[in-house]
Amino acid sequence: MDRAARCSGASSLPLLLALALGLVILHCVVADGNSTRSPETNGLLCGDPEENCAATTTQSKRKGHFSRCPKQYKHYCIKGRCRFVVAEQTPSCVCDEGYIGARCERVDLFYLRGDRGQILVICLIAVMVVFIILVIGVCTCCHPLRKRRKRKKKEEEMETLGKDITPINEDIEETNIA
């Protein structure tokens, strides 16, 4: 019974490790939306806490819900361009390709997700190359072994043939004189 308990515990260990790895990967993959509010302050992200960000904005030409960002938000977006949400008086980011997050600060690990066809072709080619290298390696190792076996087999045949044939001495003449 003790052995059965150990086996069931050992088989659940890989399952638990896989579950933990899945949770870690899921945490890294989940992307935040492009929010412009800080969760700690729940307010606007200004340089000074006392500064009124909405009061310092300059009204530029308005195109729908968004306008150009004020100069104080020039470097707000890390890998993208800034736009200002007029209704909320907050900055927002439009991230470059391959970046995600509120300020485009994270690299999107699944950026090349749409190129599955190319990834599949590359994987198939890699598997075929590995298979060819494996076959060449096996053939290279087996060929000398086969030669050695053939040589040993020939030597053994020569020995057995030599033992089966009784040597005839030509110097001695056979006579039927009894």
Swiss-Prot record:
Keywords: Cell membrane, Disulfide bond, EGF-like domain, Glycoprotein, Growth factor, Membrane, Mitogen, Secreted, Signal, Transmembrane, Transmembrane helix. InterPro entries: EGF-like_dom (IPR000742). Residues 32-118 are extracellular. SUPFAM superfamilies: EGF/Laminin. It comes from the Eukaryota. The chain crosses the membrane at residues 119-139. Synthesized in several tissues and tumor cells. Predominantly expressed in pancreas and small intestine. Disulfide bonds join 69-82, 77-93, 95-104. Residues 1-31 form the signal peptide. Gene3D superfamilies: Laminin. Residues 140-178 are cytoplasmic. One of its GO terms (cellular component) is clathrin-coated endocytic vesicle membrane. GO terms for molecular function: epidermal growth factor receptor binding; growth factor activity; receptor ligand activity; transmembrane receptor protein tyrosine kinase activator activity. Residues 65-105 form the EGF-like domain. Glycans are attached at residue 34. GO terms for biological process: cell population proliferation; epidermal growth factor receptor signaling pathway; epithelial cell apoptotic process; ERBB2-EGFR signaling pathway; ERBB4-ERBB4 signaling pathway; negative regulation of epithelial cell apoptotic process; positive regulation of cell differentiation; positive regulation of cell division. Residues 112-178 form a propeptide. PANTHER family: PROBETACELLULIN, TRANSFORMING GROWTH FACTOR ALPHA. Monomer. Interacts with EGFR and ERBB4. Growth factor that binds to EGFR, ERBB4 and other EGF receptor family members. Potent mitogen for retinal pigment epithelial cells and vascular smooth muscle cells. This is Probetacellulin. The lineage of its organism: Eukaryota, Metazoa, Chordata, Craniata, Vertebrata. The gene is BTC.
